[in-house]
Amino acid sequence: MYIVISILYITIKSLSIQNRIFYSVDLVTVFIFYMILYLRLSYALMFAILMGFSKELFSIGILGIIPLSYLISSAIIKVSSQFLDICSIPGRISTVSFAEMGKELIYILFILLYDFQCGAFLSIFKYLLLKALITGIVSVFIIPLLEKISRLLNERISQDSA
């Protein structure tokens, strides 16, 4: 279910960024946060790799950077969940924002390794900071929605098996 939703999201996002319809919010990071929080870590890591490679299908870049950045994002979520209260709203916002910021910084650092002509780093950093904050705020609304969907699916499965 998460993979289908994420592939649809990545497709819509790539089309909307080309047409500049809406601001970019990374729902894949929010799904990874949810999977680490409520499911197994191995599911979250596999999801991160699959979504990274599917995102690379729609972009032109160096193969493997996006999955690696999602894996680092997963590690940031796992480590920061030990220090922050991820059940509270500020903890969720800060954890998802840290993960998104780390993911984007790793992505930019790898691009800078291969292309040294990126001069507007400060303006990119401001954009990434705003994107990370918006993704963290949006995660507060999406996580309860995912919890409710998961609860409804579990109830449906238990009713069908009985």
Model-flagged regions — what are they?
Residues 1-162:
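Terminal, non-globular segments
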